Amino acid sequence: VIGGDECNINEHRSLVAFFNSTGFFCSGTLVNEEWVLSAAHCDSTNFQMKLGVHSKKVLNEDEQTRNPKEKFICPNKKNDEVLDKDIMLIKLDSRVSNSEHIAPLSLPSSPPSVGSVCHIMGWGSITPIKETYPDVPYCANINLLDDEVCQAGYPELLAEYRTLCAGILEGGKDTCGGDSGGPLICNGQFQGIVSYGAHPCGQSLKPGIYTKVFDYSDWIQSIIAGNTDASCPP
């Protein structure tokens, strides 16, 4: 996250850190005691998820590590289009209980409205060009913008993609490399998943692109309920 500050240790209890053999690479959001939501482009072989992390160098007493038991990506996702259905639901190999630094974030009850203030968080780069990765997550507030702003800034963003556009028009506050899969929380509701953006991060008129969680709520709830053949919206 660029243009932000170190998150308060208690304001990211649902944020999950993903690690593979090369180290930290993505985030996710705990949606209940057994399930994490992330971006499809964060799928990796043999990764672990750590919950309750603040500093990657200092262990919290209640930190928990889990492995993916099952991973679900939309069966109708166009794999050659990174922006299409960039969402992945992960079942943990065992449940996690709430603690001082761990708590789930529920799915949204309604879609967000343009103009909402949204909160971003992550261990991604805090500098736009030469990437600098912090040990602690950074947080910032940005605005939910009209989809047309992102369609103008990104010709590859098709109108039918179920995405949200969020940032600051003049630039300077944005998610960045390493923030993928983390949450966009608008007016206290979990509305987006960090999916895509410009390089360097934080350019004017090139806000971040987030998968629109609300549109996938039925799919998510179906899979959690055990209907693993559920299909995503087109």
Swiss-Prot record:
It is an enzyme of class 3 (hydrolase). Keywords: Disulfide bond, Glycoprotein, Hydrolase, Protease, Secreted, Serine protease, Toxin. Disulfide bonds join 7-139, 26-42, 74-232, 118-186, 150-165, 176-201. Its EC number is 3.4.21.-. GO terms for molecular function: serine-type endopeptidase activity; serine-type peptidase activity; toxin activity. One of its GO terms (biological process) is modulation of process of another organism. The active site is at 41 (charge relay system), 86 (charge relay system), 180 (charge relay system). Residues 1-225 form the Peptidase S1 domain. It is found in: Secreted. InterPro entries: Peptidase_S1_PA, Peptidase_S1_PA_chymotrypsin, Peptidase_S1A, Trypsin_dom, TRYPSIN_HIS, TRYPSIN_SER. Expressed by the venom gland. Glycans are attached at residue 20. Signal peptide: none annotated. Its main location: secreted. GO terms for cellular component: extracellular region; secretory granule. Monomer. PANTHER family: KALLIKREIN-1, KALLIKREIN-RELATED. Bradykinin-releasing enzyme. Releases bradykinin from bovine HMW kininogen. Has anticoagulant activity. Increases permeability of capillaries by intradermal injection into rabbits. Negative results: does not show a thrombin-like activity. Belongs to the peptidase S1 family. Snake venom subfamily. This is Bradykinin-releasing enzyme KR-E-1. It comes from Gloydius ussuriensis (Ussuri mamushi).
